[in-house]
Amino acid sequence: MNKVVKKIAAVVLSGLLVASVFAGCSGGSAKDTYTVGICQSMQHPALDKATEGFKKALTDKLGDKVTFKEQNAAGDSTLCSTIVNQYVSQNVDLIMANATDALVAARTATNTIPIVGTSVTSYGVALGLKDETATKTGINVTGTADLAPLDKQAAMVKEWVPNAKKVGILYCSAEKNSKYQATVVGAKLK
């Protein structure tokens, strides 16, 4: 199964999880409608598919009981903050944060509105949690992660170039998750 299909499947499962959260939080009296604010960090085919899959899963589960407010930050992290702050002031029922900048902005904006993230490599790294490898955040954030199997990547490098004295790892130093992956793989190559 390719990476995009896996990501879409994870988003659909995440959407179903969110639908069950809505149902479980009703306390016996379901709301008539739910409003979900979606903040996508930028336009990109993989991110677009993740958002589409999320919306489809919720719509399939909740029908016309769910409405979406969707905005794209066009790669501007400051705009992510503006978008999620609007959602917080509008008191949406849930925020879907698509990519790391959107997730960080959402968590900074609220600790009460549930946040579902996708297209995030490591929630622990992105949110500065003590346990960077945590699958449970212990806060109002959940979602799907796209962390590659770093140990297998390091093993593959060792297999392909067993006599290498040095290995260069390219990464974006401005992206916490990128630096985290480079550090982990680098340590496994030693």
Regions found by a protein language model. Name each.
Residues S26-V36, D60-D64, T133-T137, K158-K166:
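Immediate post-signal peptide segment of exported/extracytoplasmic ligand-binding proteins
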Residues D64, Q90-L94, N111-I115, I139-N140, ...:
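Loop/turn elements at helix/coil->beta-strand transitions in domains of secreted/extracellular proteins
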Residues M1-T35, T59-G63:
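Short, low-complexity disordered leader/linker segments with a strong preference
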Residues Q43-F54, L79-I83, N91, N98-A102, ...:
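Stable alpha-helical elements in mature extracytoplasmic
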Residues N72-D131:
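Beta-alpha junction/loop-to-helix N-cap segments that form part of ligand/metal-binding clefts
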Residues A57-D64, G186-K190:
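Short helix-loop-beta junction
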Residues T33-K55, K61-G63, K69-C80, A174-S178:
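Extracytoplasmic "Venus flytrap"
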Residues V36-Q40, F54, T142-L189:
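An alpha-beta-alpha
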